[in-house]
Amino acid sequence: MLKQRVITALILAAILLAKRLDAFSPELARKGPRVVIYEGSNKLVTREDKPGLKGYAVGFESLVDFVHSSAPLNRFVEQVVREEVKMFPRQAIRELVANALVHQDFEASGQSVMVEMYTDRLEVSNPGLPPIKVERFIDEFRSRNERLAELMRRMRLCEEKGSGIDKVVHLAEVYQLPAPDFRTSETRTIAILFAHQDFAEMSKSDRIRACYQHCALKYVSNERMSNQSLRERFKLPESKAATASQVIGATKDAGLVKADESDTTSTRYARYLPFWA
């Protein structure tokens, strides 16, 4: 038992602090995060393929800097703040990469954390399926690798339990981006940040996802979603109140939000809760 604990401690130290992961073992080297930058919106042309060689703590900030610097510019936010702004917020990239590192399944052989950037989106994925439903990422937290998570929190590489995804959703709203998407494949968990889209360009599913995430974010902030707050999220004028109501109605029909009946029965001043509240 003591020997196993020592081995586990050594592996943790190596995966966090190693100057080169491949100096320890081929298996550990394959756990380094890999960054791939594509020329277009598909995988046909690769601009850069950069395997992660350093331990997570040693190479984390430089990895995030590289991904952020490779992102396209956000001309829509630039017009407001009058300075160069990258499409994907650095803090959001940081949270998603840290989250993927912490929650990966280390027993999945031949797989690693992947950061893939396209012209219209950023995908961060990790081996292993989440222990909770993706719809609950905003309000729930359950770590697959608690010791690694605790060490990374102490090193200030990731947030306190459960707050990282909240920040990603909030930053998407601030930077006028579509709602991030959280998905699962057969073996991986995938988080996607999308490039800017005007409301008119968003699909119905994009609008529903944004409405649900906005509602959940409001709830965990001890607030409530309203027609007005959703219009502000989508940058819609007051004259588009009916449009916002249609989005709320579609999100209710999808079973993702519900009316807060404890507040008011008035349709005009209605407040909404996520389905799990």
Regions found by a protein language model. Give the residues of each.
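C-terminal regulatory or interaction extensions
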Residues: 1-277
